[in-house]
Swiss-Prot record:
Residues spanning the membrane: none
Residue ranges, compositional bias (Polar residues): 1-20
The protein's name in its UniProt record: REPTOR-binding partner
InterPro entries in the cross-refs: bZIP, bZIP_sf, CREBL2/REPTOR-BP
Localization (cell): Nucleus; Chromosome
Start-end of Basic and acidic residues biased regions: 36-53
CDD domains, alphabetized: bZIP_CREBL2
Molecular function GO terms recorded: chromatin binding; DNA binding; DNA-binding transcription factor activity; protein heterodimerization activity; protein homodimerization activity
Region annotated Leucine-zipper, chain positions: 82-89
GO biological process: positive regulation of DNA-templated transcription; regulation of DNA-templated transcription; response to starvation; TORC1 signaling
Similarity-based family: Belongs to the bZIP family. ATF subfamily.
Chain intervals for the UniProt region annotation (Disordered): 1-53
Amino acid sequence: MADMEIQSNKMSITEETQVQTRKECGKRGRKPGRKTSTEKLDMKAKLERSRQSARECRARKKLRYQYLEELVADREKAVVALRTELERLIQWNNQLSESNTPTNNDQLLQELGILKQE
């Protein structure tokens, strides 16, 4: 039994010294402000890659916005064309409702595909 107490005392003493040595070490990891020249070059290369990536991202964004603006302009032109066609068809419908023959009857029938060109 005495042997066990001696061993447990030795273990507790060694554990205390290990805890004390760990506490003495302080912070782990690299010391701040001590970068080697390769680390500085790596950081510069990383920074340049980041800048290049940002430039490419801005260029892609600019192209995307240009494409969308062209798409909107094309759709607006299509809307204007459809509105003029709608107004023309409404006028033609009103003339037919009044039992009048439309002035450009043949042209309209050709456009609709009812009358074939001669």
